[in-house]
């Protein structure tokens, strides 16, 4: 059966169509996972259609990725819908629960007011009744149980106990003011059901009295309020919705990460493989059978899909699950093999046992049959045959009877043992009470009864309850009668009706008297429990102990009350109760202090161990980081040297190639078709290397900081150890004070005893009473002082513990910070490794490029040397594998023409010589046209001067506005200090922007210098007009690029303004959060102030008590008044104690409120996570907007293409104008002036951007002022919260207004275009300039052709070529500088994007709060109007430079791509951080699993020990079986000997028969006639004998089966018998001494109220546990040591 249970496990249920990941052996060597669609499955095998890895074309893979992105977006939409519905449900559930709580609270408050209005006299009348009504008793019990949160009150308290509780002053007020919601009453349903019955309903309560009716209503309303309040935290629907929200967020996050990876792979355009980011699969029709145990997991893929894509995260999860399943399968297989081996061993033993039994059965059968046939062969022995058949039947039937009897005996023994099973459980059944007696022999029972009556009573009740299998309260009316020889006990037993009195008597007689015998033996041991309490009370009140010997505690209290020690019974009882309460409080406080110290010490040790482990791990990691940094530095140095060696060679080769290509292009030759070399990367690589070195230095500084933090942690640990030693010393002081208190009490007892002996007369008795009263007062004062000292010590200890807890929390926070720093350093190292890999790849590429250049260079030298007409190169050729110095390459001539091209060039030069005359004439015409263009350009210059004057006026107006704004900034300087952190970030952005602007200015200066050089060259070389036109075109391009940069800066300024506004919003939201936190802190401070006030009140009360004590000492003569005042003061002390309890309850409430606040903070954190998810949605929308912008850029490019077509048409028309060549110089000068004007405009745009930034700063300051005003006006904040919905509507209206403003802006643009005075002239001039530029470009193209022909014909080609080469080199330098500037701009853009990402996060939170400030909205509208004016002016200026805007859009698209790449990098970093967190969580889980495994190993060790014990028992049983088999063999031999004796007897009898026959020969003749009859009878007898033998054989076969079944039944019964004997309750203490060993055990009890038992009834709990543990282990109770109780809540 064990093997069957192991094999038959629940298989995994799969549905057809599901996509699963499963394991299979690839090539029979190693495991590999694959995807498959389930076709069918049974209990052990699953048939799947396998998915193959997609290795098709890139287009197919891109299609798969795009379809997967669409699927994930759909899933994200489904998750979003589920999230919104879950949020709505959660809000509805919470509102429903809160409404229920508010309604129940209102009813409860009404009931409390109704109870408070009841007269106290009326309540005393109710409690003074001797026989109250059942409804009154039940209601008062319910109120008491509910106020004390003790359900035992309703079952165990009597009417006298209830009266005592309600007699206390202000008892009703205390009960109704109890914390109902603090603790949940466990048996609320019982009270509700009982109070809703007809005889205990509200009608019955109202008929009884008004007080009972109000209390009845209070109980029901309190239970309803408690239930509604518990629903707030225990409502499972809330947790379900929270789980649904968490699942939706996790699903959205997973979808988003997968979409990001898919988009990244789609943009990269590579082929996804197993080693990359993605893995693509395609569904095939190949079916495969796989075992069901090889299924790893179910993959979330649409069954209808034909292809799918998995990310590396999903693949990693599948691989982890595959490893887990393989480990589980191996474990299961080993378990199966062990079970199989056990089953095979058991089967082998059974087969051997059955074969042996079969051999024995065959031997017995053969002997039996042989004896039958031998006896049947003899003649004239019918009697003998009958005897043998009878004996055979008896021998056959004997085993059956013996085994049946054995089974019956075993069943009877088992039945008897099961009736004495110690694992009995009491069931609630109808009961009956019977009278019983029991006697115990012994001569010292009278001594036991006299010395330990309470212990004797509890021991007897426990023992008899265990004997009768009933609870202890079922043993009643116990009477002890002790004689000189025995103890006679009579008692009543309440037992179930199905048990008779005879059965109970039998149980009582059979049960061993273990506890009673121990009491008789330990009669001289010290007293304990209530017996000790009687002695302590007698000593405290100076009573004679011998007067109360043999009395129980209840009788003792009655006798003491009858003595009339203090005139009033109630006062005396209250004094005794006060003393007992004081003692109990002292012990409880000491115990609680001990417990807290132990817990704090354990916690401190645990924290210290964890910190040491973390410090050790940090040290190891620091060492690794140092080694890694050293290695990286070495690599950086090597790469730097290598880069320096190869940079010069590579740059020279590139320069030669570019120069050759330019010269070839100028001469209409095709460019080289060799592989393009990479861009100059060595400069960028050095910068990156410098950055990495700076990162290494930062890592070193972080390591030093971590070392300092570790040292600080060690110092904090030493401080904590010192504090712990101080707390332990305080604990020892408290214990010493407790001992001193006990010694003083004993001294007072001795003094009172001595004073009693000297008194004889009544007057002396009065004096003795006065002395006793004074002694009691002194004791009370001392006790009060000691209690105050204990409380102060407890407060100080608690303060130390709280301080230590705070330090531990600080240590945890520091450790978390160090872990974060460590994670950051690891991330930096990973980035360094990636960068190092990139450098290696670049190095390999550069080396391959150098090899290709060297090989080309060597081939060119070889080919040149073979040509006789060309001059050979003087340098020696080297193998292309060797390095060539830069000087050698620079000294060589530039090779840019092939031989064929050179020959063609010579042939064409002859042709061009013939056409030279014609071209000269055309040049003359071009000069004439140029003069005309010069005149027109002068007119345009005058018009441009007028426009510049207008711009100058506008600039002056802007300056005046700046002065006005500066005045506003001076007024807001006092607010600038509060926003330094936010403005610092913006200032950094501004500085970076200024850097970019300074770079642009430098470029402008360089452009001016180039333009001046071009003018000089144009003046010197009139013949090179065509080249000047080319340069002018290049200058125009540069100007356009400058304008693009300016527009880019303007866009950046606008984005900065938006970010500033978003920062302001986020600042507002942060300040609101800070205000809420300040409110919470103020509430906490108020609560702390209330606690301090309570402490001060307690101190005042203590001072009042001292004053009262002094007054009592002065009025010692007035005994009666002193007694009354003592009673009053005792009542006041009780009130104070109750007030202390109430304050403690209030403190508990405050702690619970703090926990609720913490839960609310957690909810806020969850809401923040949701906000982050919404922000991610907005980021996706921004990406969509970026895509739209890209589309717009494409449309602009189309427009540019159309413009180019128009330009071509204009060029055709300009070909007819021959005079354009003359106007070229004038146009160049005008273009220079235009470039200068553009630079001025760029400067003006920069100023405008700065003004916009100032505006943003002003807006921030205004926002901060508004936030301060909001913080100062809390009432306004509440109203603003109420008007949040209205503000949201206003925000929507504002958005509509913004849209309208945008429309107005568009209209203004149209109107600005219509303004003829300001804009038409400028636009016309710009259009004319553009047309002229296009015409110039057409002429430049024609002139280029002419210049090329002239260069071929003119002898001055060499000079021109050299000048052109110099210009090309300068242009290349400029291009390189521009590339460097572009790289710097990209870096600045990346930094701006990082800042923008941070600002976006802040902005998304601030946008929600932006609508709350109406004044700010109005001011923002005013500012928006001003900005719109500025925007209009900027648009007018932007309209002048359309081409620059187009290039700006292209740059913006590139920047957006870079921003997306940055976002992807940030997402990857976040993924790495999350993976690190997951790894940390997995490590913690592994640690927990290791602990669980250790616990399981311990359990397995215990099970192995049990198995060993069972094996020993089985060995003993086998020995018993062997002994039984031997006994059976002996019985068989005895029976065989008996058969032989019977054979001898029969032979003797035959002889006698022969003698009789000889004597009776005379009668033979008479018998001869009967011979024939006898012969026939003999034949018939033989036939019957044969039939009987056959029947016996069949019976033997049947008996063998029954014997085997009976033997198995006997074996099972014997096992059951052994088990029941082990758990039999009739065990006795061992009489002989044996070796003992002490072991530690743990037992867990389920339940919610164990903490209350531990605190309220520790002694009862200890005694009950010791009794149960002793009975379970079959040892006396005094052998149960070191019992400690630990509540499950304290473990966590």
From Swiss-Prot:
GO BP: any one term: mitotic cytokinesis
Sequence repeat feature ranges: 1012-1025, 1026-1039, 1040-1053, 1054-1067, 1068-1081, 1082-1095, 1096-1109, 1110-1123, 1124-1137, 1138-1151, 1152-1165, 1166-1179, 1180-1193, 1194-1207, 1208-1221, 1222-1235, 1236-1249, 1250-1263, 1264-1277, 1278-1291, 1292-1305, 1306-1319, 1320-1333, 1334-1347, 1348-1361, 1362-1375, 1376-1389, 1390-1403, 1404-1417, 1418-1431, 1432-1445, 1446-1459, 1460-1473, 1474-1487, 1488-1501, 1502-1515, 1516-1529
Domain of life per record: Eukaryota
Coiled coil: 613-657, 684-864, 903-1607
Compartments in which it is found: Cell projection, Cilium, Flagellum
Pfam families the UniProt entry points to: FAZ1_C, FAZ1_cons
Chief subcellular location: other
Record lineage: Eukaryota, Discoba, Euglenozoa, Kinetoplastea, Metakinetoplastina
Function in brief: A component of FAZ filament that is required for correct FAZ assembly and attachment. Not essential for new flagellum growth.
Protein name, per record: Flagellar attachment zone protein 1
InterPro entries for the chain: FAZ1_C, FAZ1_cons
Alphabetically ordered keywords of this record: Cell projection, Cilium, Coiled coil, Flagellum, Repeat
The organism of origin for this protein: Trypanosoma brucei brucei (strain 927/4 GUTat10.1)
GO cellular component: ciliary pocket; cilium; cytoskeleton; flagellum attachment zone; motile cilium
């Amino acid at each position: 059966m064990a093997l069957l249970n192991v094999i038959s496990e629940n298989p995994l249920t799969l549905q057809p169509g599901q996509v699963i990941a499963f394991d299979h052996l690839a090539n029979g060597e190693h495991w590999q996972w694959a995807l498959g669609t389930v076709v069918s499955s049974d209990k052990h095998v699953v048939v799947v259609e396998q998915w193959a890895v997609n290795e098709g074309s890139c287009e197919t893979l891109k299609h798969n990725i795009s379809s997967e992105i669409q699927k994930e977006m759909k899933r994200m939409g489904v998750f979003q819908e589920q999230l919104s519905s879950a949020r709505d449900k959660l809000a509805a559930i919470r509102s429903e629960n809160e409404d229920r709580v508010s309604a129940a609270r209102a009813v409860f408050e009404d009931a409390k007011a109704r109870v408070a209005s009841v007269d106290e006299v009326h309540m005393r009348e109710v409690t003074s009744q001797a026989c109250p009504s059942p409804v009154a008793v039940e209601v008062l019990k319910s109120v008491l149980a509910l106020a004390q949160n003790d359900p035992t009150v309703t079952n165990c308290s009597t009417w006298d106990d209830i009266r005592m509780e309600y007699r206390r002053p202000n008892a009703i007020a205390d009960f109704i003011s109890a914390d109902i919601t603090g603790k949940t009453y466990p048996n609320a349903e019982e009270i509700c059901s009982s109070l809703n019955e007809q005889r205990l309903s509200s009608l019955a309560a109202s008929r009884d009295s008004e007080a009972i009716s109000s209390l009845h209503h209070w109980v029901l309303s309190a239970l309803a309020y408690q239930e509604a309040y518990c629903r707030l935290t225990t409502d499972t629907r809330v947790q379900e919705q929270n789980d649904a929200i968490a699942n939706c967020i996790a699903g959205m996050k997973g979808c988003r990460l997968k979409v990001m990876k898919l988009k990244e792979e789609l943009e990269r355009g590579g082929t996804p493989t197993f080693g990359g980011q993605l893995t693509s699969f395609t569904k095939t029709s190949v079916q495969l059978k796989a075992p069901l145990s090889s299924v790893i997991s179910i993959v979330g893929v649409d069954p209808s899909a034909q292809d799918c894509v998995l990310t590396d995260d999903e693949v990693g999860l599948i691989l982890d699950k595959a490893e887990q399943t393989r480990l589980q399968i191996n474990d299961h297989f080993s378990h199966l093999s062990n079970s199989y081996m056990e089953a095979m061993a058991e089967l082998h033993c059974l087969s051997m046992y059955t074969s042996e039994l079969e051999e024995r059965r065959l031997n017995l059968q053969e002997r039996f049959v042989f004896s039958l046939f031998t006896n049947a062969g003899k003649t004239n022995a019918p009697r003998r045959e009958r005897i043998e058949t009878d004996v055979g039947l008896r021998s056959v039937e004997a085993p059956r009877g013996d085994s049946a009897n054995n089974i019956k005996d075993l069943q009877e023994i088992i039945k008897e043992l099961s009736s004495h099973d110690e694992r009995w459980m009491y069931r609630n059944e109808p009961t009956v009470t019977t009278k019983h007696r029991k006697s115990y022999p012994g001569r010292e029972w009278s001594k036991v009864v006299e010395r330990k009556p309470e212990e004797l009573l509890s021991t007897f009740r426990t023992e008899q309850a265990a004997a009768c299998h009933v609870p202890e309260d079922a043993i009643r009316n116990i009477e002890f009668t002790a004689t000189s020889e025995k103890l006679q006990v009579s008692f009543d037993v309440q037992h179930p009706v199905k048990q008779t009195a005879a059965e109970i008597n039998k149980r009582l007689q059979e049960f061993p008297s273990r506890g009673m015998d121990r009491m008789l033996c330990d009669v001289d041991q010290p007293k304990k429990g209530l017996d000790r309490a009687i002695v302590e009370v007698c000593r405290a009140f100076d009573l004679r102990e011998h007067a109360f010997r043999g009395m129980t505690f209840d009788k003792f209290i009655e006798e003491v009350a009858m003595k009339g020690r203090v005139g009033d019974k109630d006062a005396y009882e209250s004094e005794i109760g006060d003393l007992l309460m004081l003692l109990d409080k002292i012990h409880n406080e000491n115990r609680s202090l001990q417990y807290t110290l132990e817990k704090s010490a354990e916690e401190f040790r645990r924290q210290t161990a964890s910190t040491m482990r973390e410090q050790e791990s940090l040290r190891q990691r620091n060492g690794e980081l140092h080694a890694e940094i050293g290695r990286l530095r070495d690599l950086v140095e090597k790469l730097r040297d290598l880069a320096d060696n190869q940079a010069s060679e590579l740059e020279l080769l590139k320069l030669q190639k570019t120069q050759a290509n330019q010269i070839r292009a100028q001469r209409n030759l095709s460019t080289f078709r060799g592989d393009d070399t990479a861009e100059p990367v060595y400069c960028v690589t050095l910068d990156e290397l410098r950055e990495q070195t700076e990162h290494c230095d930062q890592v070193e500084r972080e390591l030093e900081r971590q070392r300092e933090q570790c040292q600080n942690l060690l110092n904090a640990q030493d401080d904590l150890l010192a504090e712990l030693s101080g707390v332990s010393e305080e604990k020892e002081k408290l214990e010493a004070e407790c001992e001193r208190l006990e010694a003083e009490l004993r001294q007072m007892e001795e003094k009172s005893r001595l004073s009693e002996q000297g008194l004889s007369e009544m007057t002396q008795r009065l004096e003795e009473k006065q002395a006793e009263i004074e002694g009691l007062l002194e004791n009370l004062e001392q006790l009060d002082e000691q209690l105050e000292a204990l409380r102060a010590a407890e407060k100080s200890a608690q303060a130390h513990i709280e301080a230590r807890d705070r330090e531990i929390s600080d240590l945890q926070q520091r450790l978390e910070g160090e872990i974060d720093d460590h994670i950051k350093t690891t991330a930096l190292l990973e980035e360094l490794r990636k960068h190092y890999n990139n450098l290696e790849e670049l190095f390999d590429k550069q080396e391959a490029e150098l090899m290709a250049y060297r090989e080309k260079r060597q081939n060119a030298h070889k080919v040149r040397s073979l040509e006789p007409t060309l001059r050979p190169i003087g340098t020696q050729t080297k193998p292309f594998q060797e390095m060539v110095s830069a000087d050698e390459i620079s000294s060589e001539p530039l090779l840019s023409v092939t031989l064929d091209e050179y020959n063609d060039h010579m042939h064409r030069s002859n042709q061009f010589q013939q056409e030279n005359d014609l071209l000269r004439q055309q040049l003359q015409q071009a000069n004439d046209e140029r003069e005309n263009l010069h005149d027109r350009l002068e007119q345009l210059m005058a018009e441009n001067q007028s426009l510049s004057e207008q711009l100058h006026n506008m600039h002056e107006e802007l300056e005046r506005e700046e002065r006005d704004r500066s005045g506003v900034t001076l007024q807001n300087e006092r607010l600038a200090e509060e926003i330094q952190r936010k403005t610092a970030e913006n200032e950094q952005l501004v500085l970076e922007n200024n850097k970019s602007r300074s770079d642009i200015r430098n470029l402008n200066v360089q452009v001016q210098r180039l333009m001046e050089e071009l003018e000089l060259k144009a003046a010197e070389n009139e013949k090179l007009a065509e080249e000047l036109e080319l340069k002018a075109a290049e200058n125009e391009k540069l100007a356009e690029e400058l304008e693009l940069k300016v527009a880019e800066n303007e866009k950046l300024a606008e984005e900065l303004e938006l970010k500033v506004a978003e920062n302001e919003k986020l600042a507002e939201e942060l300040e609101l959060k800070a205000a809420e936190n300040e409110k919470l802190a103020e509430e906490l401070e108020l609560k702390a102030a209330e606690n301090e006030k309570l402490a001060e009140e307690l101190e005042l009360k203590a001072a009042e008590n001292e004053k009262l004590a002094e007054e009592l000492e002065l009025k010692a003569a007035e005994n009666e008044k002193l007694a009354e005042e003592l009673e009053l003061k005792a009542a006041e002390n009780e009130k104070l104690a109750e007030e202390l309890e109430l304050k403690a309850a209030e403190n508990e409430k405050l702690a619970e409120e703090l926990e609720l606040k913490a839960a609310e903070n957690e909810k806020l954190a969850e809401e923040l996570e949701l906000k982050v998810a919404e922000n991610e949605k907005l980021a996706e929308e921004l990406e969509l907007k970026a895509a739209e912008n890209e589309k717009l850029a494409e449309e602009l490019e189309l427009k540019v293409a159309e413009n180019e077509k128009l330009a071509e048409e204009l060029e055709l028309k300009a070909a007819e104008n021959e005079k354009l060549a003359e106007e070229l110089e004038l146009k160049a000068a005008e273009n220079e002036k235009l470039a200068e004007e553009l630079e001025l405009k760029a400067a003006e745009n920069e100023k405008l951007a700065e003004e916009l930034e100032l505006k943003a700063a002003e807006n921030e300051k205004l926002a901060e002022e508004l936030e301060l005003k909001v913080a100062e006006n809390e009432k306004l904040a509440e109203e603003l919260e109420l008007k949040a919905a209205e503000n949201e509507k206003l925000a929507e209206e504002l958005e509509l207004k913004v849209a309208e403003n945008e429309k107005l802006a568009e209209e203004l643009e149209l109107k600005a275009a219509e303004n003829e005075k300001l804009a038409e002239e400028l636009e016309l001039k710009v259009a004319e300039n553009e047309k002229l530029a296009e015409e110039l470009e057409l002429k430049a193209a024609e002139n280029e052709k002419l210049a090329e022909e002239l260069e071929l014909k003119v002898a001055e080609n060499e000079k021109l070529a050299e000048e052109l080469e110099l210009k090309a080199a300068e242009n290349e330098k400029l291009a390189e500088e521009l590339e460097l500037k572009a790289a710097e701009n990209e870096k600045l853009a990346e930094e701006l994007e990082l800042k923008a990402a941070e600002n976006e996060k802040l902005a998304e939170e601030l946008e929600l709060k932006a609508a709350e400030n109406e004044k700010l909205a109005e001011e923002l509208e005013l500012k928006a109007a001003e900005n719109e004016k500025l925007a209009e002016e900027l648009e007018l200026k932007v309209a002048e430079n359309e081409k620059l805007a187009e290039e700006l859009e292209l740059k913006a698209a590139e920047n957006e791509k870079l921003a997306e790449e940055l976002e992807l990098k940030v997402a990857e970093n976040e993924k790495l951080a999350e993976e690190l967190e997951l790894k940390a969580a997995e490590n913690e889980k592994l640690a927990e699993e290791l602990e669980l495994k250790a616990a399981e190993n311990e359990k397995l060790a215990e099970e192995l020990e049990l198995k060993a014990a069972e094996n020993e028992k089985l060995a003993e049983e086998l020995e018993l079986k062997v002994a039984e088999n031997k006994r059976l063999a002996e019985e068989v031999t005895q029976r065989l000997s008996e058969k032989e004796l019977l054979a001898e007897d029969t032979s003797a009898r035959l002889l006698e028969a022969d003698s009789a026959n000889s004597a009776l020969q005379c009668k033979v003749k008479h018998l001869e006639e009967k011979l024939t009859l006898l012969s026939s009878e003999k034949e018939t007898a033989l036939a019957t004998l044969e039939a009987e033998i056959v029947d016996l054989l069949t019976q033997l076969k049947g008996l063998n089966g029954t014997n085997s079944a009976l033997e198995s039944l006997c074996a099972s019964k014997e096992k059951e018998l052994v088990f029941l004997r082990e758990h039999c309750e009739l065990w006795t203490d061992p009489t002989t001494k044996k070796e003992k060993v002490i072991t530690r055990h743990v037992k867990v009890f389920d339940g919610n109220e164990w903490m209350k038992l531990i605190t309220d009834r520790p002694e009862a709990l200890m005694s009950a546990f010791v009794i149960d543990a002793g009975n379970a282990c079959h040892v006396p109770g005094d052998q149960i040591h070191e019992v400690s109780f630990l509540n499950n809540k304290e473990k966590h």
